[in-house]
A protein has these predicted regions:
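Nucleotide-sugar donor-binding catalytic core of glycosyltransferases
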Residues: 2-277, 282, 286-302, 361
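Generic anion/oxyanion-binding catalytic loop in active/binding sites
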Residues: 243, 269, 305, 326, ...
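A charged, aromatic-enriched C-terminal amphipathic alpha-helix characteristic of glycosyltransferases
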Residues: 325-358
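Short amphipathic alpha-helices within nucleic acid-binding modules
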Residues: 319
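Charged catalytic carboxylate motif
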Residues: 315
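Conserved acidic donor-binding segment of nucleotide-sugar-dependent glycosyltransferases
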Residues: 306-312, 322-325
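A structural signal for short, well-ordered beta-strand elements
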Residues: 247, 308-309, 343
Length: 362
């Protein structure tokens, strides 16, 4: 099978991971990214992606391949404007080639207009909200609010993040697990601020990490309550003070912290699904997370692979105290979760799942 992968120039964890997985499953020469995305090649290497030799296919070359039916599947990797515009440039040559759309955006909205624009036969959604049930075609039936276009019914499938082979590399030296629990992330949701504040003020727990802000982030990002947000807004929502800004960790230090942690916390950001959710398990660290509100096929199980805490985190200190000294229980869960990750949640497995659905449904 040969796939044309229509790209957007911006970083997009879902589409970038799926490209990585497709190259592993189909081999690089059978996955053509158009326009060629520097992040996938040597111009702007990304630490979480396996780099591939540059193959800057010109527009006329790609159009010829489509017209000559040498392309078996077109994947529009994002509903963002760059990918949509690239598809429009190719649309006249599409010639009946099956098309699918990936949507890795933070919200739960189904972008029916984008699906219609590209003529998507299947729609893959990262933030695929519960409740759901399996329909008679074997597909996931989303809430009624999703059905803005009846042509998509039974053709929308969950596609959460995963972990790439490049991001599973372990630190070269053995590190001591001297941190009870850690969390590092942008202050993109007030729940992150609440969780960090709770862990910092809990006595007897060794916590490391925090939330960071970009230079343009405002003071309201640090508010842990609606009252705090409203107060910041009434003040004109000034920039966050310098003392409150944690520097963003580089990749090496972040991975080292995961490997020093007995447990690591995943908290929703713009969407529930975070890359951290999968990276923690890849580091063989016990994942503690709020229960997901999205569909994750073959998700980890509470008490067997991971620990799901309350949405308000009130039980989090007790969880940390109970498990930090129980090395055997933690190790059993960590090893079970790691095996489950390799079986179901690598970028290669995600790509295989996507391709199998395309072969069956298109």
């Amino acid at each position: 099978m040969k796939v044309l992968y229509v790209t957007d120039p911006g970083a997009d964890y879902l589409s970038d991971q799926i490209y990585d997985g497709l190259c592993s499953v189909l081999e690089r020469q059978n996955v053509i990214d158009f326009p060629a995305k520097p992040l996938y090649h040597d111009q702007q290497p990304a630490p979480h992606l396996t780099q591939n030799p540059d193959d800057d296919s010109a527009l006329h070359d790609v159009e010829s391949m489509i017209r000559e039916r040498r392309i078996d599947l077109m994947i529009v990797s994002s509903p963002r404007s760059g990918a949509m515009e690239a598809f429009r440039r190719l649309n006249e040559s599409a010639n009946g080639t099956p098309v699918v759309l990936l949507d890795g955006e933070d919200d739960g909205r189904i972008r029916s207009d984008a699906a219609r624009c590209v003529g998507a036969g299947l729609y893959f959604k990262r933030e695929y909200k519960k409740p759901t049930k399996v329909n008679r075609n074997g597909g996931w039936s989303p809430p009624a609010t999703f059905h803005e276009d009846s042509r998509l019914e039974g053709r929308i499938y969950p596609l959460p993040f995963s972990v790439t082979a490049a991001s599973m590399s372990h630190p070269s030296s053995m590190l001591t697990r001297d941190v009870d629990i850690s969390f590092v992330g942008r202050a993109s949701h007030r729940k992150r601020v609440r969780a960090v504040n709770l862990l910092r003020r809990t006595k007897g727990i060794r916590f490391e990490g925090g939330v960071y802000l970009d230079a343009a982030d405002r003071r309201s990002k640090l508010a842990a309550s609606w009252l705090g947000i409203a107060t910041s807004k009434l003040m004109g929502d000034p920039p966050a003070p310098a003392w409150a800004q944690m520097s963003r960790m580089n990749v090496q230090d972040y991975r080292a912290l995961l490997h020093r942690s007995k447990m690591a916390l995943s908290v929703r950001g713009g969407g529930f699904d975070t890359v951290r959710y999968w990276e923690i398990v890849a580091a063989k660290t016990l994942l503690v997370s709020e229960p997901p509100d999205i569909v994750i096929p073959h998700n980890f199980e509470h008490g067997r692979h991971v620990i799901f805490c309350r949405h308000d985190f009130h039980d989090l200190p007790a969880i940390v105290r109970r498990l930090r000294d129980d090395d055997q229980v933690r190790q059993e869960m960590v090893e079970a979760a790691y095996r489950h990750l390799l079986a179901y949640h690598t970028s290669e497995r995600r790509a295989t799942y996507l391709l199998d659905l395309c072969r069956r449904m298109l």
